Structures are given as C-alpha cells and as structure tokens.
C-alpha cells in the first residue's frame, strides 16, 4: 500500500528559481526508501516538498489514506532552551494526544535504548550533537506514525547510536511503517534500504532496488557508490 505518492513537476523557493524537476516516486508500507545524493542535490528540498513546506511547487503530493500520520526527524536538532529531555517528550506526547500510560512506556523504552535515561531531567541544549540527534530520533519514533521522513540521520551518531537507530528501523518496518530517508552515506544505505532514489542537481537520475540501479548503470556487480558515480558520468 502506498503511504505517499510524490509527483513534482517543478519546485523551488521561488517560481523563477526552480530547484526540483520531474520528481516522481512512492513510499509503500514496510519500505525503507533511500534518497541518495551529494550535498546540494535537492534531498532536503524534496523532503520539505513532501511535507508541504516548499513555497512553490507544481505537482501533487498524495497521501492515499487521509488518516496517515508522519514523523519528521530533521538533520539539525530543534530543541527548546528551557525544557528538559523528559519535558520535550511530554510535550510531543501531548501534541500527539498520547495517553500517559503509553507515553511513559514508550519514552522509557527509547531512553534506555539510546542510553539517555539518566539524562532525562537535563536540558538537551547542553548535550553533544550526537546526543541531541538521539533526542530527535526518540521524539520521532515515540509517536509510531505510519510514515517516517528522516533527513541525514547518521550525522553525529556514534556506532552504538547507529546500531540502535537501525534496530528501530527494522522494528517499525516489520510493523508496517514506511521510511523515506535522505543520506549521502552510500555504504550504509546500500546495506539497509529496500530501494533507492538517486538525485543529482534536483532531478532523479535513477531509482529502484540495487539490482535495478546496477542494470541502469551497467555495473552488474557494482556497489551503490560505484553505480552512482557511473550514472553521474553518463549525465555529463
């Protein structure tokens, strides 16, 4: 089942300064779709478009189920100066109309998973970048939506944090959630994503599973990195 269907003819922050062109893809239940490309390729802009945050867009973003909820986990942590970690979680639970019992159970489980339980009464603005990234992951996964939109989740995560994140990804996919994740970490993406959307200069140069990407790049045994470089060379 499609959780979101994206059809962007063009998009940008100004109508006269378009960034995206001819972007079409879907995210299905149980999928982890990797939005792959270098810095400045348009990955974050595509995510903003999916969420309706781009000032100009010609096209359509369709959520077939009107009741589909999504969680957005940004690349840069967004935190309140005067709220403790626990208060951040309480606030998110209140916005999501989560019962107190469910909130406490999920929050404590995630805090322990990411080894932040002892820090729950501290201010996250004083945390390291990696710890702040874990806070954003906890906030997103605590809500258990049908769709996760995740922007560069690996930046700042230590190996334990990355393992914990990947464990959660497997769990929510098994529960039927879909994930749209942008990253330029091709080695990790190759290992975990079910399909890929390769972006260059605001347009799709290839998409599909790894086998399809290999066929399109004419590298039958190539890594995702090698395939991406080959496809870029074909564009030039």
Kindly label every feature range from the protein language model.
Residues 1-6, 10-22:
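A short, flexible loop at the N-terminus of ABC-type nucleotide-binding domains that lies
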Residues 36-38:
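The feature captures the beta-strand-to-loop junction immediately N-terminal to the Walker
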Residues 148-152:
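Catalytic Walker B motif of ABC-type/P-loop ATPase nucleotide-binding domains
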Residues 123-130:
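Conserved ABC ATPase signature
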């Amino acid at each position: 089942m499609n959780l979101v269907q994206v059809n962007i003819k063009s998009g940008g922050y100004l109508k006269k300064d378009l960034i995206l062109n001819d972007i079409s893809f879907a995210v299905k239940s149980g999928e982890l779709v990797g939005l792959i490309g270098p810095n400045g390729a348009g990955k974050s802009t595509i995510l903003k478009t999916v969420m309706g945050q781009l000032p100009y867009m010609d096209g359509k973003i369709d959520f077939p189920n009107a009741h589909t909820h999504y969680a957005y986990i940004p690349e840069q942590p967004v935190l309140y100066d005067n709220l403790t970690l626990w208060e951040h979680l309480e606030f998110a639970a209140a916005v999501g109309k989560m019962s107190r019992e469910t909130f406490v159970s999920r929050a404590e489980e995630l805090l322990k998973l990411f080894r932040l339980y002892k820090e729950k009464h501290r201010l996250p603005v004083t945390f390291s970048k990696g710890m702040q990234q874990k806070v954003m992951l906890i906030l997103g996964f605590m809500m258990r939506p049908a769709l996760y939109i995740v922007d560069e989740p690996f930046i700042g995560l230590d190996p334990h944090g990355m393992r914990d994140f990947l464990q959660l990804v497997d769990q929510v996919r098994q529960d039927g959630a879909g994930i749209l994740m942008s990253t330029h970490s091709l080695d990790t993406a190759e290992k975990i994503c079910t399909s890929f959307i390769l972006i260059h200069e605001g347009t799709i140069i290839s998409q599909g599973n790894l086998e399809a990407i290999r066929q399109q790049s004419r590298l039958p045994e190539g890594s995702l990195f090698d395939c991406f470089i080959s496809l870029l060379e074909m564009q030039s």
